[in-house]
């Protein structure tokens, strides 16, 4: 089972930006935890981060070509306005799980709306790194349920 984890704009700065919202964990540390959990769950986890919207869209297109089993995405600020990322994700035939370290619904009003939510199977927000770990578990469960038919 292949799970693709996508991290959007500014998320490479985890550990350096706003520790009140995001804690001090780095993206590399999050990736390590996801790899370890993926191994426990029988999933191979691939990681991609970009601060460039076109690069992110191209990686999502490649995920379609590669026929990945599920996508876990934290699009960062793109969550709230990038119809380009949303439309690229809509091409995928696999489950999409949206995750956020902070509770986007308890922050600034512009963060309350996600353009990705309507095409995602679910959204997990506000639990720090555990949002990613719960998201990975959810993605694996969705893939396993689909295979069990």
Curated annotation (Swiss-Prot):
The positions flagged as active site in the entry are 22 (proton acceptor), 100 (proton donor)
Please indicate which residues carry the site annotation Transition state stabilizer: 17
Name of the protein: 3-dehydroquinate dehydratase
GO terms classed as biological process:
amino acid biosynthetic process; aromatic amino acid family biosynthetic process; chorismate biosynthetic process; quinate catabolic process
Top-level class of the enzyme under EC nomenclature: lyase
Q: Which UniProt keywords apply?
A: Amino-acid biosynthesis, Aromatic amino acid biosynthesis, Lyase
The protein's Enzyme Commission number:
4.2.1.10
Q: What Gene Ontology molecular-function terms does this entry list?
A: 3-dehydroquinate dehydratase activity
Q: Which gene encodes it?
A: aroQ
Q: In which pathway does it act?
A: Metabolic intermediate biosynthesis; chorismate biosynthesis; chorismate from D-erythrose 4-phosphate and phosphoenolpyruvate: step 3/7
SUPFAM superfamilies, per the entry: Type II 3-dehydroquinate dehydratase
- Please tell me where substrate binds in this chain: 74, 80, 87, 101-102, 111
**Any coiled-coil ranges, and where?**
none
What the protein does? Answer: Catalyzes a trans-dehydration via an enolate intermediate.
Q: Which InterPro entries match?
A: DHquinase_II, DHquinase_II_sf
By its UniProt entry, which CDD domains does this protein fall under? DHQase_II
Q: What HAMAP family does its record include? A: AroQ (MF_00169)
The family line of this record is:
Belongs to the type-II 3-dehydroquinase family.
Instruction: Please provide an example of a Pfam family that matches this protein in its UniProt record.
Output: DHquinase_II
């Amino acid at each position: 089972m292949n799970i693709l984890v996508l991290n959007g704009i500014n998320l490479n700065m985890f550990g350096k930006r706003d520790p009140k919202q995001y804690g001090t964990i780095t993206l590399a540390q999050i990736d390590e935890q996801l790899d370890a959990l993926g191994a426990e769950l029988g999933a191979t986890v691939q990681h991609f981060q970009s601060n460039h919207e076109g690069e992110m869209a191209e990686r999502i297109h490649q995920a379609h070509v590669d026929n990945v089993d599920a996508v876990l995405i934290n699009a960062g600020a793109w969550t709230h306005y990038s119809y380009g990322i949303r439309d690229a994700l809509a091409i995928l035939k696999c489950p999409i799980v949206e995750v956020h370290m902070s509770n986007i619904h308890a922050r600034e009003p512009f963060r309350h709306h996600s353009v990705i939510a309507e095409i995602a199977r679910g959204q997990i927000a506000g639990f720090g790194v555990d949002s990613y770990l719960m998201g990975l578990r959810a993605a694996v469960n969705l893939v396993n349920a689909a295979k069990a038919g």
